[in-house]
Amino acid sequence: MSARGTLWGVGLGPGDPELVTVKAARVIGEADVVAYHSAPHGHSIARGIAEPYLRPGQLEEHLVYPVTTEATNHPGGYAGALEDFYADATERIATHLDAGRNVALLAEGDPLFYSSYMHLHTRLTRRFNAVIVPGVTSVSAASAAVATPLVAGDQVLSVLPGTLPVGELTRRLADADAAVVVKLGRSYHNVREALSASGLLGDAFYVERASTAGQRVLPAADVDETSVPYFSLAMLPGGRRRALLTGTVAVVGLGPGDSDWMTPQSRRELAAATDLIGYRGYLDRVEVRDGQRRHPSDNTDEPARARLACSLADQGRAVAVVSSGDPGVFAMATAVLEEAEQWPGVRVRVIPAMTAAQAVASRVGAPLGHDYAVISLSDRLKPWDVIAARLTAAAAADLVLAIYNPASVTRTWQVGAMRELLLAHRDPGIPVVIGRNVSGPVSGPNEDVRVVKLADLNPAEIDMRCLLIVGSSQTRWYSVDSQDRVFTPRRYPEAGRATATKSSRHSD
């Protein structure tokens, strides 16, 4: 019995026969059998590319797809028709390999990059040895045709199939530094819609049949979507956003701390900025990028940071002002917008993020599940009597309270005063969630989250790194496997009905 043959997955490159690699040309010429695909019309693009390298007397296997985009009467539908085709093609190739013949199975582009070859590779490599000969991809050929740098430095290239749903494609394009969308054809309408929805249609190129005599390069917005072939792609080069965003200030929320809680939009804004402004500790959480200028400061002079941001933007810079948590919650958005009133030529955008209250609440369950108020205990920017009046009103309204800035090195008495105000309206057993250094999906080494009764809240244990959540009369607290769970039901007792249900957990 002769030795089995070897399956060669041969990448032909994007279409120009001169872009076939030296190794691919040799393997094609030496193979006993050359196999290639085609649509039902019978014309094989792969064979046309490889023809200069074929030799007389070679066996050929023409694998004709039964269906591509047209309808089928196969009982299993489109998927069933293709499954039968792949099963038949697998056995045809296997017959040659079993007979000891080496088979070169051709693939446009690269064999393992959105290729027809892969469907047979996964089936045949269970039984036979396979060797891959890589090829120049359509992405490289299209980039050469556009003659514009595609990605540079630490930019990330996203390669996306045009068959994705419009919403998903829009999201991924908006998040990308640079992108290439393949598998166009009938999907181009959706691709164009996604490019438009993400504000990127004017930056994108359309490349058709790259590297061949039929190559065309057009602005993506100018393409007649009724005549787009499958062998085409849309290209969105990197480095375009910085020019578009000059003269702007983006106030960017970093989230509570861990980079896993930073949104893609925030990452995108930070990457596009020419200048980063913020408290030094917050800037340290932002990845360093070549060419960006950083303007760190301490954590007190917000007006000065806002003035610097507007001044730089007025000079044509793309400025990002960073805030921990959400920039609109006791953070920099207010200061920047207030300053921007004096700079009519400066555009300000606020980029939202996860808040500290949301982060702490997630650790114990859903204490913010019903109406709640957010109050800062800091009296640096407003007098204590205003804070006390708001605490009293919120307590009387039976709202859950999220308490920001509860204490600092120089401000230590407000937590105790708050506790006494609330005890005039709340049951002493109401749960208070104390969250310290909650900063990511996984608890960090410095994180501490506890639940105590309102009457047991100890001001000496609270500092600036803490956020407090004080329950309402309906908030419930229980333990599972020594873990505190706290939630506030969405429903509320009807007016006039007794509300004696206590939120404290049962006494031991």
UniProtKB/Swiss-Prot annotation:
GO terms for molecular function: precorrin-2 C20-methyltransferase activity; precorrin-3B C17-methyltransferase activity. GO terms for biological process: cobalamin biosynthetic process; methylation. Residues 1-243 are annotated as: Precorrin-2 C20-methyltransferase. InterPro entries: 4pyrrol_Mease, 4pyrrol_Methylase_sf, 4pyrrole_Mease_sub1, 4pyrrole_Mease_sub2, Cbl_synth_CobJ/CibH_dom, CobI/CbiL, CobI/CbiL/CobIJ_dom, Precorrin_MeTrfase. Keywords: Cobalamin biosynthesis, Methyltransferase, Multifunctional enzyme, S-adenosyl-L-methionine, Transferase. It holds the Pfam family TP_methylase. One of its GO terms (cellular component) is plasma membrane. Pathway: Cofactor biosynthesis; adenosylcobalamin biosynthesis; cob(II)yrinate a,c-diamide from precorrin-2 (aerobic route): step 1/10; Cofactor biosynthesis; adenosylcobalamin biosynthesis; cob(II)yrinate a,c-diamide from precorrin-2 (aerobic route): step 3/10. This is Cobalamin biosynthesis protein CobIJ.
